[in-house]
Amino acid sequence: MEFNSEFLATLCARGYLHQLTDATALDGIMSSGAVTAYIGFDCTANSLHIGSLMQIMLLRYLQRFGHKPIVLLGGATTKVGDPSGKEKTRAMLSEDNISANKEGILRVIKKFLSEDVVVVDNAEWLGNYGYLDFLREIGSKFSVNVMLGLESVKSRLSRDQQLSFLEFSYVLLQSYDFVELHKRYGCILQIGGSDQWGNIVSGIDLARKMGCPQLYGVTTPLLLNSSGAKMGKTADGAIWLDETLYSPYNYWQYFRNVPDQDVGRLLRLFTELPLSEIERLEALKGEELNEAKKILATAVTSICHGAEVALQVENQALKVFEHNDHDELRSITFSRKTLGQGIPISKLLHMWGLEESISAGRRLIRGGGCKINGGVVLDEEKLLNCGDFDDNGGYVAVFCGKKRRLKVVLED
């Protein structure tokens, strides 16, 4: 359908929209005035990664179009653990861990949003809610028959995977969050990933049973690449939005190196470039598409880390990859004593984090994919010794494939 609301029309045009409840009614409300909406983040890590970037972009669009976003931090629900999309029970976190994670997540979110965003912790109302009172007042309004049909529950049980009562009850807590946010802030819209659909609909149903007016829900699609795999992680781990956990340089490189087929979609999702410009960029072919990837990488990095940092890392990357400036390579030090009489390059690639195993290093060398100081390594048993460093000014430049590059400086 065509939306009158700028917010929903943008979601539809840029590929954010997966499911929504009562589209016509929600569109009418959002096109006639400001709406309060919330997105929740449990505090399971001390940062968010790009798997949460769609939700963060929607918070930005809510602000842009004059609506009122609420960021809900799960200080209480983190203690329980959402089973949605998980194959096993999450590890229990201590109060100190949750508190530290909450601070880290908040620090990330504030980079993306203006200062007037409302931030709330559901521990404010769930933390002191008595167990028996909660069961009587909230639990009585849920049907176990319906709960067993939730995808988060059904998928675990169908695979004969353990689901604790703690996780089973998570939907009650998230549902009550929606009710409480409506009471306190007049919130009528909850936004989440597609795995949150069951929890969102349950919250709408609970609100109706507790006498609230009609509430609404919107979900975004899973973040998948063109081959159908989840995006958000590399061999080195998650693509964190905190610069201390994942450098702006690596962040830029990640988006610069996405598959050709993903460029247009990621430009729509993670940049604020006009759609007409995105259509022009995604129509580029061959080598020209690399320019679109650079624009994508710089635009995404600018939103996360700031325009000045984005320009710096773009220039740094271009010096390394297009002008072979070794001074701009990521640098590590390596002990002369450790190197001794020489170590096989295949082993060093693993030690330096460039390959996941020694055998992977050997395969790379056999395929001609490893260069040391510009020369292709042909012998998978070749040793690297101190002379290789001394003959090159005290360092070696290691290139693995097209993307992994490292400057290793020898120290006494």
UniProtKB/Swiss-Prot annotation:
Per the Swiss-Prot or TrEMBL record, what residue ranges does the short sequence motif 'HIGH' region cover?
43-52
**Which GO molecular function entries does the Swiss-Prot or TrEMBL record give?**
ATP binding; RNA binding; tyrosine-tRNA ligase activity
Keywords carried by this UniProt record:
Aminoacyl-tRNA synthetase, ATP-binding, Cytoplasm, Ligase, Nucleotide-binding, Protein biosynthesis, RNA-binding
The catalysed reaction is:
tRNA(Tyr) + L-tyrosine + ATP = L-tyrosyl-tRNA(Tyr) + AMP + diphosphate + H(+)
Q: Which SUPFAM superfamilies match?
A: Alpha-L RNA-binding motif (SSF55174), Nucleotidylyl transferase (SSF52374)
Zinc: present as a keyword of the record? no
Single biological process term from Gene Ontology: tyrosyl-tRNA aminoacylation
E.C. designation(s): 6.1.1.1
Location of motif 'KMSKS' region in this chain is 230-234
Q: Which InterPro entries match?
A: aa-tRNA-synth_Ic (IPR002305), Rossmann-like_a/b/a_fold (IPR014729), S4_RNA-bd_sf (IPR036986), Tyr-tRNA-ligase (IPR002307), Tyr-tRNA-ligase_bac-type (IPR024088), Tyr-tRNA-ligase_bac_1 (IPR024107)
Q: Where does ATP bind?
A: K233
- GO annotation, cellular component aspect: cytosol
Binding positions for L-tyrosine per the UniProt entry: Y38, Y170, Q174
Q: Where in the cell is it found?
A: Cytoplasm
Domain named S4 RNA-binding: residues: 343-409
Q: Which CDD domains match?
A: S4 (cd00165), TyrRS_core (cd00805)
Q: What does this protein do?
A: Catalyzes the attachment of tyrosine to tRNA(Tyr) in a two-step reaction: tyrosine is first activated by ATP to form Tyr-AMP and then transferred to the acceptor end of tRNA(Tyr).
Q: How does it assemble?
A: Homodimer.
**Alphabetized PANTHER family for the sequence:** TYROSINE--TRNA LIGASE, MITOCHONDRIAL, TYROSYL-TRNA SYNTHETASE
Q: Which family does it belong to?
A: Belongs to the class-I aminoacyl-tRNA synthetase family. TyrS type 1 subfamily.
Question: Sorted alphabetically, which HAMAP family does this protein's record hold?
Answer: Tyr_tRNA_synth_type1
| Name recorded for this polypeptide | Tyrosine--tRNA ligase
Gene this protein is translated from = tyrS
